[in-house]
Design a protein with these regions (language model features):
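N-terminal Rossmann-like FAD-binding beta1-loop-alpha1 element of flavoenzymes
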Residues: 5-32, 394-399
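Glycine-rich FAD pyrophosphate-binding loop
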Residues: 24-48
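An anion/pyrophosphate-binding glycine-rich loop and adjacent beta-alpha core
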Residues: 37-39, 44-45, 53-60, 93, ...
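Glycine-rich active-site loop/strand segments that organize a redox cofactor
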Residues: 50-98
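Feature captures the FAD/FMN-dependent oxidoreductase FAD-binding
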Residues: 77-155
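A glycine-rich dinucleotide-binding beta-alpha-beta segment and adjacent secondary-structure elements
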Residues: 128, 297-376
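Glycine-rich loop(s) and the adjacent beta-strand/alpha-helix scaffold that form part
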Residues: 155-201
Length: 400
């Protein structure tokens, strides 16, 4: 005989714990199931262990989806300020890093303990670690067959996330359930991920691994151009850092990315105008703008000797160098994949869901929340805010 609840939430991550705590505190009986032994591993490792738990600037414009309007309702009903108020209630010390990004002063564990306490307040029951073997629809709702027994509920919430970082337990469970109930899925792909390049083409830049600098980075055509100003990091296989993670969510295979290594300097004009006054050789002069190792590598890639005097270089060569540094175009051959992706773009098609409750329109009582849905935030706390907002929306909608 199965144990019955008002709701079963599968996935004890950010969205799942938020949903369970909200429903539980509204007097609903809730069971939270997860296949992992530890709670919310993604929270634990995020932000270098300090969890970038939200962003004060979070709004619909910071999210990607085939339906960009879908996230508006949930984000407006549970805002970054709402989550911050919860953090303050638990006296968790935090700081704003930049661009509205909020981090714990001490540890991401503070956020996990807070969410666990909120679940305890709602008398949420737990089954962890517990593998789900099968989900069935019944006349009374849903039945979940697990290695620890059979559980049933009028409502079932899928909060198992996407495919990112499989080493901490990511699986395609949410997509399996979506397919079982004939829901459309927007093709998942890695997002917020380092980009890679053809090994032979990248060879001259391998020695630059570890170099970091602020850049403008862009992709897309004139109508759909996306640009960010963030730090870029050279790696042995390509490019990473916040700039590249941001643009990776917008980049399409086969497209170029354009990097402006000197976003506030028109290098060609500066070099040509300074031919008579700049006494340094070209390498030393460029090293006033970018790390010396990068200056040397870029000069070599442009066929210019580092010890050349600026006055001895033609305007054409200087303009070519300037263009290559202000408008450096590269075509990635791929990304580092789900192994290093912070999130998954794509997921359950939002047209299948109610934007107010996250419930499947044609399957009463079935909900999808968090990263399992085709809503992907920018880098900087936006994806956690979507977890809180979508979890709150579903938790508020669950009925006895």
């Amino acid at each position: 005989m199965s144990q019955h609840y008002d709701a079963i939430v599968i996935g004890a991550g950010a969205a799942g714990m938020m949903c369970a705590s909200v429903a539980g505190q509204r007097g609903k009986s809730v069971l939270l199931i997860d296949h992992a032994a530890k709670l919310a591993e993604k929270i634990r490792i995020s932000g270098g262990g300090r969890c970038n738990f939200t962003n004060l600037q979070a709004g619909p414009a910071n999210y990607l989806s085939e339906n960009p309007h879908f996230c508006k309702s949930a984000l407006s009903r549970y805002t970054a300020q709402d989550f911050l108020n919860l953090v303050k209630k638990y006296r968790i010390a935090y700081h704003e890093k930049h661009k509205g990004q909020l981090f714990c002063d001490d540890s991401a564990e503070d956020i996990i303990r807070m969410l666990k306490s909120e679940c305890d307040l709602g008398k949420v029951q737990w089954r962890m670690p517990c593998q789900v073997k099968e989900v069935q629809r019944t006349d009374a709702g849903y039945q979940v067959l697990t290695e620890q027994g059979i559980f049933s509920a009028a409502q079932l919430v899928i909060a198992t996330g996407g495919l990112s970082i499989p080493k901490i337990g990511a699986t395609d469970f949410s997509y399996q359930i979506a397919r079982q109930f004939d829901l459309k899925i927007v093709e998942p792909r890695p997002a917020l991920v380092p980009l890679t390049f053809d090994p032979k083409a990248w060879e001259p830049f391998v020695p630059m691994a570890g170099i970091s600098l602020e850049v403008d980075i862009a992709t897309g055509d004139k109508k759909n151009k996306t640009i960010f100003r963030e730090d870029l990091l050279f790696t042995h296989r390509g490019l990473s850092g916040p700039a590249v993670l941001q643009i990776s969510s917008f980049w399409q295979p086969g497209e170029a990315i354009t990097v402006n290594l000197l976003p506030d300097v028109d290098l060609a004009e500066e070099l040509i105008a300074g031919k008579g006054t700049i006494k340094k050789n070209i390498a030393n002069h460029l090293a006033t703008y970018v790390p010396a190792r990068l200056a040397e590598g870029l000069l070599a890639a442009n066929g210019i000797a580092g010890d050349a005097k600026i006055a001895d270089l033609t305007d054409k060569r200087l303009r070519q160098l300037g263009d290559n540094m202000n408008r450096w175009q590269l075509i990635p051959n791929g990304s580092e994949g789900y192994r290093k992706a912070e999130v998954t773009r794509g997921g359950v098609d939002t047209r299948e869901l109610s934007q107010q409750s996250m419930m499947v329109k044609n399957c009463p009582g079935l909900y999808f929340i968090g990263e399992s849905v085709d809503v992907t935030g920018w880098l900087g706390g936006y994806n956690f805010q979507w977890a809180w907002s979508s979890g709150f929306a579903a938790g508020s909608a669950i009925e006895s």
